[in-house]
């Protein structure tokens, strides 16, 4: 046959046989009777027979669990077919439905049944509708799609009506008794209705819902891990977004073995999300392979498949893949990286070693990093930022997990140019032999060679250098080398003339050379002597410089008091009087032989204060107990000038009840002595500490722990010393050292109270109520007779007297600059006296003073403008007065308790921090402190205003008592008063200001008016008006002199009583023993 004809014949056969061959391969079973539907009578029986080429099964509609009337059995057929018989007895409405026979091998778990169908009706007049399925009453369809209401009837001839419950209207639609009503129905509730035996029957409501279906399917597969070890759990998520009308099928290696748990979770926030999870616990290597999830749209022919590969290892592993060799090189200062790739599971821990020691993570020029490139792929990088010579060494990367540890090591060599470490001349003494050593290093190790130049003056010409020739007798050479260095030595048996020798070291990175001059032995000794002299000279110069620096940094004594001469127009610059330009009146001079010194009351870095007895200082008091200020014998000239300045300022100021008054001075034929009043009770801080246990306050139950503000332990009170000005050195107050008992000269004490304070002590022991008190409560306030306790009235009295004393200093344009309780003394009668005790205080070791350059400053007492701008005025003294007021009402507490003077302290002062009210202060007293601590100096009250405020808190009787004591003082023959009175008859008493608004002018500006009471030195003062005699009687404050009518004529000190040469202080003490009243001979202070 022709080939073309044969091909056509074969193709035709295929076309004819092909479809039958396909049908023959998958034929459907056969049901007998061979009909589409049958109607069976109620309670009858029927049989269905199914025949197939393989095993067959039935799907029947019987949904009544209580009636087991269906029997299925198999029969054998001689033709080799498989036969299944379905027998139904006592048929009922529950048996109405579709019966399907199918081959078993054609069905899967998730596929629809494909077989041969027959529909059976069993009419029941009482049950016109076939029983519905479990979920048939909920109908969900896509928008604009046809819906099926499955109200099937048991009788095919029944007429059925569909009604909408909400509208109660009949819905016209196509009806099939095997399926129900089909059509496009709006959402709502529907019922089916039919009539049987003249009765109307209705179904349960059918709920119809529609949704807008998404045609697109968005699927994501998430597998946190794709690599596992045997025994771990595999978890894979298949996520469907924005579509819930889908079906999902898993395909994976373990599905045939029935392993795996499949779950689904749905969330609608923030968007529609279906998460299908496949979980396989205790994975094995058989679970390795491809995992697939197929998502199929429920109503559309859409399908999306996602796949991933899972690998399960029997155990963990680590594989290292270095990108470099076992020995590497890097140039000096080169940036170089070394990378190692890793394939490992589980994730390993990685670290680098250098010379078997862990590389520190804080290195700045060697960094390590780890990057994960894939799930089981990693990359570790060692990077040299600027390679250094010391970076050479053995580097090791160690990788380890819970099952395995692996490492990779390599040697790194840093190439370094040749470098000569030292070139030395080793002289061998008298033999004349000299050895020159050259030590060099580099990587690679350099080679060394020697050159010599014998014409020493022309060695800068390289052509005169020649290679050093060695011979065994005169010149020899030795070389020693290790892995890093090389040392070459040249030995000369004898050098007869000076020459230069050059060492050259070279390797592949560079060449370096150093030269050395070799000197003949005869010249060496001369050079040695010259060098020794030069070194000695340098040492001497350095020592002198150090001594000068130490001398300049040593603190110098300076008087704190300053007298203002003028002020700049803007008020920010003050010009102070140079005390050395003030005159010194010789009338203050007192003969040295009239002064007997006793024990030391206090000593400091610059001087001391000594108790003394002055003979002939006063006409009415032949012997007076005094305090004598003097410098130490080692004092410098600048400190002598400072003490002389203090003397001149005191003579300029004049006398006042509330300052420590000058009594005399010894300035000739010996050291300078300043003689001042002696105050029996010492400084105010000491007095407050001593009497704080006897303080009568509104809070007598206050516990002892409140003493912590003083930095003291109450249990130690019995051991604390309170003798005049002698204190224990606790660092809080003056470093007053106890005097040597061998130096002590006994002083006479008064036998009766002073005639200027002969007023009994008040019984007033309660806080001032600031109302007028009866005379019986305030009588004899200024006396210290009898009871040793303290009251709030005493504290107000101290405050008032300090304010009066500072008012007097302010009227003299005097700025104190160190106003504090330690610089306030207490005399008999509780008379307060302001002083400057800096000379006798060890301020270098006093915590109240802070070093600033060559001086020490009491920072905690200073105003902000003094601390930060070095500006001292009367208004800055007002700030210090507020601090002193806090000290008084805290009974001697240290200001800013618990705070040290540092940057934090300064910042707090700048930001407006102020101390809280002390325990014993009333709100009125604390208000005074706050006014004194105003950050703007011009808004602080003046001392005159402060005196008025405190005076208003005191009883009127106290004011009268104080004015009486002041008046008696100014009329007395006190040496300070008489010397000033003899200078001028113009009284200080009664000087006042024209207007109240000029109070600020007293601190901030002065005119050209001058007082004649200033010892002849002219100081500018504000405008003042003299007052009348009546006004003078009402306010007698400021006088440092009395009027001519009350003046007591006195002579100079040279005409007063002089101590006999053979008389001692001990002789005076004996006067009491023989009945002589010494009270007229000794005046304790001026009282």
From Swiss-Prot:
Superkingdom assignment = Eukaryota
Q: Keywords for this entry?
A: ATP-binding, Cell membrane, Cell projection, Chemotaxis, Developmental protein, Disulfide bond, Glycoprotein, Golgi apparatus, Immunoglobulin domain, Kinase, Membrane, Nucleotide-binding, Phosphoprotein, Receptor, Repeat, Signal, Transferase, Transmembrane, Transmembrane helix, Tyrosine-protein kinase, Ubl conjugation
Query: What does the PTM comment state?
Result: Ubiquitinated, leading to its internalization and degradation. Autophosphorylated on tyrosine residues upon ligand binding. Autophosphorylation occurs in trans, i.e. one subunit of the dimeric receptor phosphorylates tyrosine residues on the other subunit.
Regions of biased composition (Polar residues) lie at 1039-1057
Membrane-spanning regions, if any? 531-551
Quaternary arrangement and interactors, per the entry? Interacts with homodimeric pdgfa, pdgfb and pdgfc, and with heterodimers formed by pdgfa and pdgfb. Monomer in the absence of bound ligand. Interaction with dimeric pdgfa, pdgfb and/or pdgfc leads to receptor dimerization, where both pdgfra homodimers and heterodimers with pdgfrb are observed.
Q: Which family does it belong to?
A: Belongs to the protein kinase superfamily. Tyr protein kinase family. CSF-1/PDGF receptor subfamily.
Q: What's the name of the protein? A: Platelet-derived growth factor receptor alpha
Q: Which gene encodes it?
A: pdgfra
């Amino acid at each position: 046959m022709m080939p073309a004809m044969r091909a056509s014949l074969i193709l035709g056969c295929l076309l004819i046989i092909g479809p039958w061959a396909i049908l023959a391969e998958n034929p459907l079973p056969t049901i007998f009777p061979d009909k589409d539907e049958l109607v069976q009578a109620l309670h009858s029986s029927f049989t269905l027979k199914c025949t197939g080429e393989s095993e067959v099964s039935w799907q029947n509609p019987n949904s009544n669990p209580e009636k087991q009337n269906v029997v299925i059995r198999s029969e054998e057929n001689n033709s080799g077919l498989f036969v299944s018989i379905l027998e139904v007895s006592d048929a009922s409405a529950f048996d109405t439905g579709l019966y399907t026979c199918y081959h078993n091998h054609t069905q899967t778990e998730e596929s629809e049944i494909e077989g041969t169908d027959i529909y059976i009706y069993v009419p029941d007049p009482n049950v016109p509708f076939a029983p519905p399925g479990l979920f048939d009453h909920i109908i969900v369809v896509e928008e604009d799609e046809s819906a099926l209401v499955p109200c099937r009837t048991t009788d095919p001839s029944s007429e059925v009506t569909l009604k909408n419950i909400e509208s109660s209207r009949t819905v016209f639609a196509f009806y099939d008794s095997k399926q129900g009503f089909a059509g496009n129905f709006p959402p709502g509730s529907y019922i089916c209705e039919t009539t049987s035996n003249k009765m109307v029957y209705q179904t349960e409501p059918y709920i119809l819902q529609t949704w807008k279906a998404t045609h697109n399917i968005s699927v994501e597969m998430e597998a946190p891990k794709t690599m596992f070890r045997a025994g771990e759990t595999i978890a894979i998520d298949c996520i469907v977004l924005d579509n819930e009308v889908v079906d999902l099928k898993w395909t994976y290696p373990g599905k045939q073995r029935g392993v795996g748990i499949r779950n689904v979770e749905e969330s609608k926030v923030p968007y529609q999300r279906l998460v299908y999870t496949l979980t396989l616990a205790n994975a094995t290597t058989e679970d390795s392979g491809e995992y697939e999830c197929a998502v199929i749209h429920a109503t559309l022919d859409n399908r999306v498949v996602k796949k991933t590969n899972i690998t399960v290892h029997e155990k963990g592993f680590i594989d290292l893949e270095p990108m470099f060799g076992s020995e590497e090189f890097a140039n000096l200062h080169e940036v170089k990286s070394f990378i190692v790739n890793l394939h490992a599971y589980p994730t390993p821990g990685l670290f680098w070693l250098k010379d078997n020691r862990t590389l520190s993570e804080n290195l700045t020029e060697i960094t390590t990093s780890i990057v994960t490139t894939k799930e089981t792929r990693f990359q570790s990088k060692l990077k040299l930022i600027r390679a250094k010579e010391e970076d050479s060494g053995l580097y090791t990367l160690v990788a380890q997990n819970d099952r395995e540890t692996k490492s990779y090591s390599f040697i790194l060599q840093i190439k370094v140019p040749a470098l000569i470490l030292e070139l030395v001349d080793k002289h061998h003494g008298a033999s004349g032999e000299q050895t020159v050593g050259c030590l060099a290093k580099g990587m690679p190790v350099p080679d060394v060679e020697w050159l010599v130049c014998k014409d020493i003056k022309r060695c800068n010409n390289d052509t005169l250098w020649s290679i050093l020739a060695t011979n065994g007798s005169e010149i020899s050479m030795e070389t020693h080398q290790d892995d890093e260095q090389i040392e070459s030595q040249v030995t000369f048996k004898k050098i007869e003339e000076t020459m230069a020798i050059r060492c050259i070291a070279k390797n592949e990175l560079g060449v370096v050379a150093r030269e050395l001059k070799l000197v003949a032995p005869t010249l060496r000794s001369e050079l040695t002597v010259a060098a020794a002299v030069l070194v000695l000279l340098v040492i001497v110069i350095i020592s002198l410089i150090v001594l000068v620096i130490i001398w300049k940094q040593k603190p110098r004594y300076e008087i704190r008091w300053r007298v203002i001469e003028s002020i700049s127009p803007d008020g920010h610059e003050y010009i102070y009087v140079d005390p050395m330009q003030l005159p010194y009146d010789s009338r203050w001079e007192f003969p040295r032989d009239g002064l007997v010194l006793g024990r030391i009351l206090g000593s400091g870095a610059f001087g001391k204060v000594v108790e003394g007895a002055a003979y002939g200082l006063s006409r009415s008091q032949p012997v007076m107990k005094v305090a004598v200020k003097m410098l130490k014998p080692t004092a410098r000239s600048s400190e002598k000038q400072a003490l002389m300045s203090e003397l001149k300022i005191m003579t300029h100021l004049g006398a006042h009840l509330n300052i420590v008054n000058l009594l005399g001075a010894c300035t000739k034929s010996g050291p300078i002595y300043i003689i001042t009043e002696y105050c029996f009770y010492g400084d105010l801080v000491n007095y407050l500490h001593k009497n704080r246990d006897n303080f009568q306050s509104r809070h007598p139950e206050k516990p002892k722990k409140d003493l912590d503000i003083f930095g003291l332990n109450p249990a130690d009170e019995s051991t604390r010393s309170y003798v005049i000005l002698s204190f224990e050195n606790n660092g809080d107050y003056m470093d007053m050292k106890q005097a040597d008992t061998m130096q002590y000269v006994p002083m006479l004490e008064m036998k009766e109270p002073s005639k200027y304070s002969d007023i009994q002590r008040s019984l007033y022991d309660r806080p001032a109520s600031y109302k007028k008190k009866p005379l019986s409560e305030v009588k004899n306030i200024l006396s210290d007779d009898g009871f040793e306790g303290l009251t709030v009235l005493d504290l107000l009295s101290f405050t008032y007297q300090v304010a009066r004393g500072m008012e007097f200093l302010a009227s003299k344009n005097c700025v104190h600059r160190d106003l504090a309780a330690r610089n306030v003394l207490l005399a008999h009668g509780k008379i307060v006296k302001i002083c400057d005790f800096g000379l006798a205080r060890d301020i270098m070791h006093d915590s109240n003073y802070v070093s600033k350059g060559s001086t020490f400053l009491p920072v905690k007492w200073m105003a902000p403008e003094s601390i930060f701008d070095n500006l001292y005025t009367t208004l800055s003294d007002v700030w210090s007065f507020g601090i002193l007021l806090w000290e008084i009402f805290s009974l001697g507490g240290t200001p800013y308790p618990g705070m040290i003077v540092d940057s934090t302290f300064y910042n707090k002062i700048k930001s407006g921090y102020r101390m809280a009210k002390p325990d014993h202060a009333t709100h009125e007293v604390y208000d005074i402190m706050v006014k004194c601590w105003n950050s703007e100096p011009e808004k602080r009250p003046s001392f005159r205003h402060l005196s008025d405020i405190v005076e208003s808190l005191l009883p009127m009787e106290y004011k009268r008592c104080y004015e009486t004591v002041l008046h008696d003082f100014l009329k007395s023959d006190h040496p300070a008063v008489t010397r000033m009175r003899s200078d001028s008859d113009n009284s200080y008493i009664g000087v006042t200001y024209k207007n109240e608004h000029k109070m600020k002018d007293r601190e901030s500006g002065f005119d050209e008016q001058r007082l004649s009471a200033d010892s002849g030195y002219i100081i500018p003062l504000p405008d003042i008006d003299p007052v009348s005699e009546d006004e003078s009687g009402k306010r007698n404050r400021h006088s440092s002199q009395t009027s001519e009518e009350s003046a007591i004529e006195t002579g100079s000190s040279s005409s007063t009583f002089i101590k006999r040469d053979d008389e001692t202080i001990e002789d005076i003490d004996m006067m009491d023993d023989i009945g002589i009243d010494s009270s007229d001979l000794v005046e304790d202070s001026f009282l």
